[in-house]
Amino acid sequence: MNDNQTLNEINYKLSFFWIKKIIILLLRFFGIILDNFYKKDFYFCGDNNLESYFFGYHDKKPFNNDDTKIIFHSYKNLKSLENQSKKKVSINLINLKKRKLLILDNTKAWSWQLGSSLQWHPNKDIVFFNKKVNKRYITRKIDLNSNKTKDLNFSIYNISPKGDKFLIADFVKLGMLRKGYGFKKKKSQMVFLNKKSKLEIIINKNNKRKTLHLFDETKKKDVLGSYINHQTFSPNGKKIGYFYTLLKKNNQRQIFFYHFCLNKKKNYLVNISKSKLISHYCWRNNDEILITMKENEKRYLYIIYNTETKKIKTLNSKLNKDGHPMFNPKNKDLFVSDTYPNLFGLQKLFIFSLKQNKVIWKRYIYSPYKFRGILRCDLHPRWSNDGKKIFIDFIKNANRNIGIFKTSV
């Protein structure tokens, strides 16, 4: 191949790149026009254009136990979102009745998708989040009634329904192997990517760390590293669902979904299909899990998997896009979910009824093109504890924001 051929190929690829980008931007511009026709009946929405607001992942609730307060992150807007990921974010609280914002603290231990694992105690006005103190990652606990603060010697992922146990995560490892989900470290502080991953739990009574299950891939030469992510308790706190991922040398990720039974002290692989990729999940009850699963390159499935009987039920075929589901805490017939932006940049937020086998409520939210990849802003819908409101992260005026919808379904 001569130099002219090489140059022609480069010019062709560059031309194709710009043509593709222009088409995408034109479609997104049309999406902005469409967005103006869709209903935006927010009960609450952040209104400070100088700051960006967001909560985090869809497996936690920003509402306190009686739904009178919400917690979320904020940061002052910068031109470069990449620069923001190196800075602190504020931990905030709003009283929904008074609409008054209170800054509780700040943290550098956060990521775009998970935030700082900010969450409430299930029954008390106590807030937990990850924080970096004296070069160590810890969990900060703030009791809003007593104004007392306590630092716990672990990084929290999720708290149990009774508030007596914590699931913890290796966020530094996540930050290296799953960008956008973990904590960043300087190159000089990079830790060795070992091939061992632990499912760990903290018992609240004595803060004792316990390993529930150990994965060891050290003998597998084609494995570069491994990590555990998205650990959640079943409603009664007796089971734990989670993803275990292998990073292969061919830059491929092999993802497995497990549930661990605390009573039996056993780990179970959810072996639905070797060819279908499980992407997101939520607990419906103590035995059933709602799963979004990739069927092929263009289509996803929503299925309900029973951890006891191993039976699978596939939902309405029109639910063919990936999303982040959560069941209504008061009505297990209903779940809320979302979609990723389509060609026009529109994300769909919807409520699905299992009994009616259809979508019974929906809204469309526009997402600008610059919020993609690691920097994307998924809606990550979450119910309030009374099952009457839905909280989302979204983009408003080119900034991250939070919004709450009231529903009457």
What are these regions (language model features)?
Residues 299, 316-356:
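Loop/turn-rich, solvent-exposed surfaces of beta-rich toroidal or solenoidal domains
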Residues 277, 316-326, 358-382:
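Conserved blade-ending motifs and adjacent loop-strand segments that build the rim/top face
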Residues 81-91, 135-140, 176-178, 195-200, ...:
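Structural motif
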Residues 60-70, 110, 114-130, 157-165, ...:
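Blade-terminus and WD-like Trp-Asp/Gly-His loop motifs, strongest in beta-propeller folds
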Residues 51-59, 77-79, 83-132:
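Blade-loop segments of beta-propeller domains
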Residues 106-198, 213-223:
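Asp-box/WD-like beta-propeller blade repeats and closely related beta-sheet repeat scaffolds
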Residues 43-52, 104-111, 209-224, 361-373:
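Surface-exposed loop and turn segments in beta-propeller and other repeat-based domains
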Residues 17, 73-87, 169-197, 242-254, ...:
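Short, conserved, GDST-rich strand-edge loop motifs in beta-rich repeat architectures
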